[in-house]
Design a protein with these regions (language model features):
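Charged, gly/pro-rich active-site loop segments
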Residues: 77-150
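Solvent-exposed residues in well-ordered beta-strands and their adjoining turns
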Residues: 40, 49, 68, 86-88, ...
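Short beta-strand segments
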Residues: 17-49, 65-66
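Short, basic/aromatic recognition patches
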Residues: 1-21
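Short acidic (Asp/Glu) patches
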Residues: 48-51, 60-68, 116-123
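Helix-adjacent hinge/juxtasegments
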Residues: 53-60, 64-86
């Protein structure tokens, strides 16, 4: 059976996952990239370094965020949220960074710290991240969710 998720089910999917995908666009290109995240009940919180994703989001802050939980072809849920990207600074960045670290620390300590199967970050990238992390949020304006169950 195909169906739409309730508001509570959408919130549960957002709260219970730590890996999603940001979809953003710049001029004639669309870019979708997996990221680790935390959900604070209103916004998606993430961190990154300079690169294509940040370039696109700075140019066009309107974006979407997608999360799914797929058990098999006939048992899955998917949530899409649309919102506006914001870079965070100062105390707000520190607060959101703490929230993000608390949410993703279980996967890091469980040895699953590379959810994107990238392997360890190259030394130069890791050094850049530690020195100049970009903390951001996506302020959600709209959410939708679907499921299939048999």
């Amino acid at each position: 059976m195909l169906g739409e998720l309730t508001k509570k089910e959408i919130e549960d999917v957002l709260m219970s996952n730590v890996v999603g995908r940001i979809g953003c666009s710049s001029q004639q290109k669309i870019y979708v990239v997996p990221v680790t995240y935390a959900y604070d009940g209103e916004s998606i919180i993430g961190h990154t370094v300079e690169g294509m994703k940040i370039d696109f989001l700075r140019e066009n802050p309107e974006c979407c965020f997608q999360i799914d939980d797929i058990k098999n072809l006939f048992d899955w849920v998917s949530v899409i949220a649309w919102g506006t990207f914001e870079e965070l600074k100062g105390e707000e960045a520190a607060r959101c960074s703490d929230l993000l670290m608390k949410r993703i620390s279980p996967i890091v300590s469980a040895g699953a710290s590379q959810p994107h199967r990238m392997g360890p970050l190259p030394t130069a990238r890791q050094a850049t991240f530690e020195k100049n992390p970009i903390i951001y949020r996506i302020r959600i304006k709209e959410k939708s969710g679907r499921f299939e169950r048999r």
